[in-house]
């Protein structure tokens, strides 16, 4: 149904006249891929189709074929090591923590400040606050101390009804959960450790190439400061002489689409 809507209402194209490029999540089961293929050929009569892994397209969009992609969207985050265009499935890690959880967490900590956000409409407001005002601290404890001793980190936000709210340490406490999932009561490792674990599951000969090409992708990697913090945290985990580079392309929110566009025009 959603594909039908996309073809006929949004794109307004005849699917039988165009080859189709579909994307899939890392570790997508073979049955899903078969079903996608069946629908494209049998329902829409596509002349040709290809299914690409989202993280691989993000890597292509950054102009690379080897690297590790940290892809974090609304529902799930993945770390995907890729060597010469091929994802390495045995080393892919999944983290059930992403944008939606951060919005929920921000709703919770704003409630502690005395603001009440409960309805779906209010949730959208909190998502907007998250996208506009949140950032990742380079040193969380130090930032907490700064926030406690001065109002320099405070920002105000005007709600649709004209009420103005002030947000302080919530600005960086919210995305900190990506590095410390314990904030959300989760026992999993943060995105820095997950990336490190992915690299360590790869052949020792390619680790150097992965450390030097850590590519961020997806809307939940859009927080200011996230690349520097990632660099700092991975450097702490990695061997001392290792060169580590985190790449955060400005268009990373749409890098899967951009990579698909590149692949489709080859």
From Swiss-Prot:
The keyword ATP-binding applies. InterPro entries: Actin (IPR004000), Actin/actin-like_CS (IPR020902), ATPase_NBD (IPR043129). One of its GO terms (cellular component) is cytoplasm. It catalyses: ATP + H2O = ADP + phosphate + H(+). Keywords: ATP-binding, Cytoplasm, Cytoskeleton, Hydrolase, Nucleotide-binding. It is an enzyme of class 3 (hydrolase). SMART domains: ACTIN. Actins are highly conserved proteins that are involved in various types of cell motility and are ubiquitously expressed in all eukaryotic cells. Belongs to the actin family. PANTHER family: ACTIN. This is Actin. It comes from Crassostrea virginica.
């Amino acid at each position: 149904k959603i594909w039908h809507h996309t073809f006929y209402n949004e794109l307004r194209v005849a699917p039988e006249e165009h080859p189709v490029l579909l994307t899939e999540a890392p570790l997508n089961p073979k049955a899903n891929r078969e079903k996608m293929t069946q629908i494209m050929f049998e329902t829409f009569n596509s002349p040709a189709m290809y299914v690409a892994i989202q993280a691989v397209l993000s890597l292509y969009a950054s102009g690379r074929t080897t690297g590790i992609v940290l892809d974090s969207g609304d529902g799930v985050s993945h770390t995907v090591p890729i060597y010469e265009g091929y994802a390495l499935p045995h080393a892919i890690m999944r983290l059930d923590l992403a944008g939606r959880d951060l919005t929920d967490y921000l709703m919770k900590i704003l409630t502690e400040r005395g603001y009440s956000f409960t309805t779906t409409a209010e949730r959208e407001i909190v998502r907007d606050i998250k996208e506009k005002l949140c950032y990742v601290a380079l040193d969380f404890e130090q930032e907490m101390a700064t926030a406690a001793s001065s109002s320099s980190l405070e920002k105000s936000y005007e709600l649709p009804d004209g009420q103005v709210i002030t947000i302080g340490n919530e600005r960086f406490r919210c995305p900190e959960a990506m590095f410390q999932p314990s904030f959300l009561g989760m026992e999993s490792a943060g995105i820095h450790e997950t990336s490190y674990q992915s690299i360590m599951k790869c052949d020792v000969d390619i680790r150097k190439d992965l450390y030097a090409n850590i590519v961020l992708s997806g809307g939940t990697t859009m927080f200011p400061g996230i690349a520097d913090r990632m660099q700092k945290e991975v450097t702490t985990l990695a061997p001392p002489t290792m060169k580590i580079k985190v790449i955060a392309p400005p268009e990373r929110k749409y890098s899967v689409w951009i990579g698909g566009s590149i692949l489709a025009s080859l």
